[in-house]
């Protein structure tokens, strides 16, 4: 069904990414506050990133409190809008799929194509902003670790490898009462991969820890050593989360060379040079990371878990389900983080 009647009122721009704008918006019928991401499809790479995000989020059959929820995706062409469905044979949708596959525009360039993603609205910025503008809090650290491990276990259970986990891509929803810890939501699935079943039993879900990918992508300071090589599985997400948790616990920061913004992220220091952890481990798999770097002491189990997550050998890292269980055990069995 094609319609020209808008369902949403855009209130203000709240974010600007590499391939789209994000607005705060209201649902006209209910007044519900939502986030709307607008992506112009004038470049094949924009189309590919947008479709990857759509395919990943639309493949999820249930919701998780720590994963951004896609309410709907609307395709707009020259003023006409249509709700986009995965696998649709729509004359508006198919040219976008062809553009993504071929790497060149497969529709009339005179037409204006846009994709609108309607998602949860998060009012607390991203994880970088939240952590780095507040005093260190054990309670917050514990809450965030449990939320992120739960989100990753959910994604891997749904055969989704994120491939670009970093604090910038983790959004914060403030608690209503201002007392409880905020809710984190993993977002930005433009580089994600939905693993499909293969082998003798196509009905059996794909094992993301045995599904090998070859496209080296992500953000260098969070990339696992095997991603730099171009042969990796979902264990690369475990490594990225290890960098995030390590940086959060010790307030380790890097500086974005373009924006000069301080970001949570781990690194290896070589003289005046700052090297991503994954790159350093690729060059020297026997490199022993200094964990903790800043704190005088760190919980023994947490220290051991971080070293496992950041192992150069992906086989030595826990999978997402093991990680979630280990963090629950650390959070609820150890009453102090200092022993």
Curated annotation (Swiss-Prot):
Enzyme Commission code: 2.7.11.1
Keywords: ATP-binding, Kinase, Nucleotide-binding, Nucleus, Serine/threonine-protein kinase, Transferase
Protein's cellular compartments: Nucleus
InterPro entries assigned to the protein according to its UniProt record, in alphabetical order: CC_SR_Kinase (IPR050339), Kinase-like_dom_sf (IPR011009), Prot_kinase_dom (IPR000719), Protein_kinase_ATP_BS (IPR017441), Ser/Thr_kinase_AS (IPR008271)
Annotated ranges, domain Protein kinase: 8-332
SUPFAM superfamilies: Protein kinase-like (PK-like)
Residues involved in ATP binding: 14-22, 37
Catalytic residues as annotated in Swiss-Prot or TrEMBL: 164 (proton acceptor)
GO cellular component: cytoplasm; nucleus
Any one GO biological process: negative regulation of G2/MI transition of meiotic cell cycle
Catalyzed chemical reaction(s): L-seryl-[protein] + ATP = O-phospho-L-seryl-[protein] + ADP + H(+); L-threonyl-[protein] + ATP = O-phospho-L-threonyl-[protein] + ADP + H(+)
Pfam families on file: Pkinase
Superkingdom assignment: Eukaryota
One Gene Ontology molecular-function label: ATP binding
Protein family according to the UniProt entry: Belongs to the protein kinase superfamily. Ser/Thr protein kinase family.
Protein name: Serine/threonine-protein kinase pdik1l-B
Originating species: Xenopus laevis (African clawed frog)
